[in-house]
């Protein structure tokens, strides 16, 4: 994101941005019902890098799939560009654990601007204390 654009978004309210998008014909460009784990962070800003989860088949989603370095979750964590926000679309299912403290810490170390999910996080008590 260009620095001049970023500065504009840093001072704009979410309502103002949503109204501007609405005027451009983009409706419902936000996820309802979200709340920050870390209440001390005032605003998160970055372009979106999105991962969409689909329901897992119990016969195919064995624990071994998570050892694969090409697993979509691992690839997303490693490919999410610096200063982007990683968005996990979990179909609003809180049982879909989008990530845990290890992957969130990895994203932070890699320079990710933040993480959003409409599902759940494992280790949320640890994630909220990551600085």
Q: Where is each model-derived feature located?
A:
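Feature captures the catalytic cores and cofactor-binding loops of soluble hydro-lyases/lyases
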Residues: 1-131
């Amino acid at each position: 994101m260009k620095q001049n654009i970023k500065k504009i978004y840093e001072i704009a309210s979410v309502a103002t941005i949503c109204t501007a998008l609405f005027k451009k014909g983009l409706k419902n460009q936000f996820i309802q019902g979200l709340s920050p784990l870390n209440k001390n962070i005032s605003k998160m800003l970055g372009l979106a890098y999105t991962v969409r989860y689909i329901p897992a088949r119990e016969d195919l989603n064995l624990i071994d799939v998570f050892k694969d370095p090409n697993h979509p979750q691992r690839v997303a964590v490693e490919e999410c560009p610096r200063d982007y926000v990683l968005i996990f679309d979990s179909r609003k299912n809180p049982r879909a654990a989008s990530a845990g403290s290890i992957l969130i810490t990895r994203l932070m170390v890699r320079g990710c601007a933040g993480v959003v999910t409409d599902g759940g996080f494992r280790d949320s008590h640890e994630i909220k204390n990551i600085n």
